[in-house]
């Protein structure tokens, strides 16, 4: 009897992950025979665990916080968008035994913002909180939407400024510390820090969200994250967490692995309904 193909997501922490549920729904929808699990893999064990997974018959991996830049280094070859981001969230074992790295975060975020939430980013002022691997993965697609300005705020200013040098050819991008945000307003604020995973909120001026502005947290949880609640308190038109992005980027990874694109809207609706029921 043929065994189902094996896939997994590696992260640290990982117990909150909805990825196994998402890929189970994708597999049922498309008739694909596979198993997808979530594995807690600390950074110091990442490479050995990846090698062991693929040596043991695994076909593909997702990598989440804090492993995306390590996955970029490990991959033998990379997609154009992964090369640009210098971060990888999807690994594929090729027939020749080499490991291919892709980054589906940016297109996943863009599809959720644009197609699911109905946001038009052209001419807007965008603020991204954090300058890690998650931010690297979303910068190029966001700048391709031609915002008026994109600002990256980070506790370590030099890290944010490094990204402005790397991505400055794609559009108007600048880096700064959180203190430099005083007196500025933005139409879309994206939280790409890990603060929500520990129940914290990045330090933001009270009036930083422009009237009619929106908030988006790349993280997600069973309950609204502190950043999503902050956006709701500021009367954001949209204040959403990253569950839609997670589904959209997962669909792109599923396409890479299986050659078929699942429908995302039914899966997003199922997850939202399950969250409401669980409350």
UniProtKB/Swiss-Prot annotation:
Pathway the protein acts in: Metabolic intermediate biosynthesis; chorismate biosynthesis; chorismate from D-erythrose 4-phosphate and phosphoenolpyruvate: step 4/7
Keywords, alphabetical: Amino-acid biosynthesis, Aromatic amino acid biosynthesis, NADP, Oxidoreductase
Record-linked SUPFAM superfamilies: Aminoacid dehydrogenase-like, N-terminal domain (SSF53223), NAD(P)-binding Rossmann-fold domains (SSF51735)
Top-level taxon of origin: Bacteria
Binding site for shikimate: 17-19, 64, 89, 105, 220
The reaction(s) this protein catalyses: shikimate + NADP(+) = 3-dehydroshikimate + NADPH + H(+)
Gene Ontology molecular function: any one: shikimate 3-dehydrogenase (NADP+) activity
Record-listed NADP(+) binding positions: 130-134, 218, 242
Cited Pfam families: SDH_C, Shikimate_DH, Shikimate_dh_N
Gene3D superfamilies referenced in this protein's UniProt entry, alphabetically: Leucine Dehydrogenase, chain A, domain 1 (3.40.50.10860), NAD(P)-binding Rossmann-like Domain (3.40.50.720)
Enzyme class: oxidoreductase
GO CC annotation, single: cytosol
PANTHER family in the cross-refs: BIFUNCTIONAL 3-DEHYDROQUINATE DEHYDRATASE_SHIKIMATE DEHYDROGENASE, CHLOROPLASTIC, SHIKIMATE DEHYDROGENASE
The protein's assembly and partners: Homodimer.
UniProt function note: Involved in the biosynthesis of the chorismate, which leads to the biosynthesis of aromatic amino acids. Catalyzes the reversible NADPH linked reduction of 3-dehydroshikimate (DHSA) to yield shikimate (SA).
Entry protein name: Shikimate dehydrogenase (NADP(+))
Naturally occurring in which organism (per UniProt): Methylococcus capsulatus (strain ATCC 33009 / NCIMB 11132 / Bath)
